[in-house]
Amino acid sequence: MSRICEICGKGPSFGNNVSHANNKTSKIWRPNLQKIKAVKNGTVRSIKVCTRCIRSGHVTKAL
């Protein structure tokens, strides 16, 4: 569970790079994960959270 947000479960997306000659190579879009110290279930833990969850207030940072 290394590249998955622990709050919303967002993970990598898969697709293709497509050139003008219509050649396709595989591509991975990874979420912007940040390792932060947050309060979860009353305890302070270091968790990986995507920036959207941090920005929208789904997680409270520990002081």
Swiss-Prot record:
Keyword Ribosomal protein: yes
Keyword match Ribonucleoprotein: yes
Pfam families the UniProt entry points to: Ribosomal_L28
SUPFAM superfamilies listed in its UniProt record: L28p-like (SSF143800)
GO CC terms of this entry: ribonucleoprotein complex; ribosome
GO MF annotation list: structural constituent of ribosome
Domain of life of the organism encoding this protein: Bacteria
GO biological process: translation
Key words, A-Z: Ribonucleoprotein, Ribosomal protein
HAMAP family: Ribosomal_bL28 (MF_00373)
Entries under PANTHER family matching the protein: 50S RIBOSOMAL PROTEIN L28 (PTHR39080), LARGE RIBOSOMAL SUBUNIT PROTEIN BL28A (PTHR39080:SF1)
Entry similarity comment: Belongs to the bacterial ribosomal protein bL28 family.
Name of protein: Large ribosomal subunit protein bL28
